[in-house]
Amino acid sequence: YDKENDTHINPYSDQAFYYITYGGDPGLRISPLNEPTGPGDAITTFNDYQFHEVDDFSPAKVGRRWFGNRFDIQDDQSYAFEFPNIVIGSDVEVNINVASASESATSMAVSLNGTAIDPINFGTISGSTLLSYRPSSQNSAPYIVPASGETVTVNLLYNNGSNPSSIGYLDYIRVGAVRQLIAGSEQFSFRYNLAATNFGIGEYSIASASQISQVWDVTNTTAIAAKANNESLNTLTFKAELGSLREYVAVSPQDYYTPVSVSDSGVQNQNIKGTIFKGEDGNFQDIDYLIITAPFLLQPAQRLAQYHIAQRGLKVKVVTLDKIYQEFSSGKQDIGAIRNLVRYIYENASAPENRIKYVGILGDSSIDYKNRLPGNNMVVPTFHTLFSSSTWTSYMSDDFFGMMGADPSNGNDEGLMGSNEKVDVAFGRILADDVTLANAMIDKIVNYEKQASYGNWRNNIIMVSDDVDIDWEFNKLQVTLNELSDRITLEKPFVNVKKIYMDAYEQQTSAGGNRYPDVNAALKNDIEVGALIVNYFGHGGEDGLAQEFIVDKDMASTLFHPGKYPLFITVTCEFSRFDNHTRPTAGEMLYQNPTGGAI
């Protein structure tokens, strides 16, 4: 179980890889268990847990929390967990995390071993809330029932609130129980939770242990120690200091796990750490700009790198994801590997002033790290929050990769996405999932920077404000934008600030709802004339800006102003989210327009 991700399943990969090599220095070895001397308190039980968790559905299409079993057609489902040699009468702890998508009030009835306990009640969904998520007992505390047998049965019955469109979802069930420390012919893991709070020496006693060859202390996976059962004793004992929680594995030669060799498992020698700072002459060279991409986009990535080397004199390196994963995450997909590469480059510059400044990601992204969704276009992963029930609380961001420094408030390294953290390296992303689109977006960059594209239009800034529907919006939207516009005019008098405040225009009613046709026309004209920046404050969604759609998908994809591409700054909601390939956004279309839209 991973507390940070609140899951028993790795969110990024279903496989773990280990490298096997030979020659060179000896690797780590398992050392004999160092047992304390003196009498010990007998420990004959251990804490075991099991879970049921399947990641098949992302109901809200936001965040990194996925769900398994659906409760719609089959609203009554049971799950059985077996605990051999359970201690009868001991506490069984059950955590149940579930969710509901319904515009009506719904609930989940829960019973453990046939005994009904408090139901889980869900709120309704509306607006930005797309899912009502509830951990067990409403506050993450486990249900506790006495053990009555070796089988623990959890039954869930979803009440859809008389709304046939309601759907319930199971995140996971986790069951913890106390078992007698009795072995068999299979290997098993064990821990004794009270060891963390007790003091002195504990003496573990494993019964029926004749087929157990060793017990490994795996608390520290880089310093494993073993207690051997060379004489095949039926009762195997060993001692350990109490005061901390320790993890053990009882090893049975009859139940060794067999590693699987994946197809094309050979890994070519590589050494990013040893070569990333080498220039063409073989000498040390700091890096200004790193481009990260997938192997199939290597050609356009190298083209972009060569352009910045030739035009800007930047020191640029291109690294593909497969190489990053091989060196920084043992071959599996993990967003931490990308950040660790950037941090390695950042920390090993010749001087602080020579640290890496820019990272460009060439490749689209998706909420689906594991390619479960048909047509998924995951190229380079991004960071997603654990919050997965609302577009208000969930977000994705590449900032995670660029937070390099130490957080002075808690002494921890940055990268936890806290509000007090700052980005130390500038990140950008080219949204492309094939070579053609990647090259088209690079063409856009090249054309934007050509001398022929320069002109007075780069002195123009367009400031756009949503209309005011609620009193507080006046200060937040129009007053704030007006103050910003006046400050720009004062400090940069050569800049032409064009204000487009929707409330200054006539609102019209159409079959599709309220609209501002004059705002659409003015904004389209000003963009095509040319503007360095378009700054928008207000509401927005995947289909456009403002409820009146002053920029919609059609406008975003048909704007035509080659070379004169503005930087769009939108202080709004999910206008430019790019992680759901089943619903392209207006912001994506604005960016991917090859002859217009945003740079």
Feature locations, PLM:
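Cysteine-dependent hydrolase recognition
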Residues: 1-599
